[in-house]
């Protein structure tokens, strides 16, 4: 494996595994005694419970059925939309539950922290742990540990197919794809912060429906864009698919930044108009 691939893997590992908690720590240190860490953890649970504990196990069970496999192969567009919509719906339930938990002391900063927790824990679990595994695999390849593991597995009568397949996948993946995984996490974390902000602002203003629907629409759109990769080999080249995906995801991320800035201004204006209790005589 060339040095560029190794650097790309390390950069994505840093972005997905180290940046989320590090950024939260810096944010919490800048805004002490404002419940940043508790909001981050609540936001993280808003992803972990509905997605990791509920939706993904359901999808894993369905993926073992012939009917589901056949449907995904013959109805790619509907399948991609269904994955995007259910991801948005399940995570919306987590975002709403998080916002309700924070409602008694729901500030813009805590809402942002919840969004960072939601996107951060997703980055850690979905990408960070996978790339940590890649790094361990690389170390094994460089030190001879991989060959020793294969030899031991073979001597014990085990199947080494999975090990060899993992090695081939790691060695033959273009370096740009490793780097794009980190870039995608940066985009996704920004979008998750904005989507959680939409829900939190809806709870804050007691106008839940329009803001949660906006969140659902945005999440479905973002994940449906990612499903374009399902069409690779079906009239769409890998290069073209990834170009379309990342151009569109970047556009959605720009929109997410606009959302964050707009809600920040509105929230600040509302807080400025509030009259402190201790000033009332």
What are these regions (language model features)?
Residues 1-281:
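Hydrophobic alpha-helical segments at protein termini of multi-pass membrane proteins
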């Amino acid at each position: 494996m060339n040095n560029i691939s190794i650097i790309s893997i390390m950069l994505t590992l840093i972005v997905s595994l180290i940046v989320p908690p590090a950024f939260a720590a810096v944010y919490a240190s800048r805004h002490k005694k404002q419940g940043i860490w508790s909001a981050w953890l609540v936001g993280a649970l808003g992803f972990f419970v509905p997605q990791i504990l509920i939706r993904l196990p359901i999808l894993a069970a369905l993926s073992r059925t012939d009917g589901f496999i056949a449907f995904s192969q013959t109805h790619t567009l509907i399948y991609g939309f269904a994955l995007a919509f259910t991801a948005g719906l399940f995570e919306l339930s987590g975002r709403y539950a998080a916002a309700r938990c924070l409602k008694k002391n729901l500030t813009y900063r805590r809402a942002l922290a919840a969004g960072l927790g939601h996107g951060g824990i997703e980055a850690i679990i979905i990408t960070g742990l996978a790339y940590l595994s890649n790094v361990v695999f690389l170390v094994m390849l460089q030190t001879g540990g991989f060959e020793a593991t294969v030899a031991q597995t073979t001597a014990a009568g085990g199947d080494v197919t999975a090990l060899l397949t993992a090695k081939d996948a790691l060695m033959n993946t273009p370096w740009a794809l490793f780097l794009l995984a980190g870039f995608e996490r940066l985009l996704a974390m920004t979008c998750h912060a904005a989507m959680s902000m939409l829900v939190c602002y809806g709870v804050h203003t007691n106008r839940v429906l329009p803001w949660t629907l906006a969140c659902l629409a945005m999440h479905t759109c973002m994940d449906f864009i990612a499903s374009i990769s399902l069409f690779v080999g079906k009239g769409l080249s890998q290069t073209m698919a990834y170009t379309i995906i990342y151009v569109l995801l970047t556009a959605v991320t720009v929109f997410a930044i606009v959302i964050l800035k707009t809600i920040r201004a509105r929230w600040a204006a509302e807080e400025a108009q509030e009259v402190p209790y201790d000033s009332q005589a």
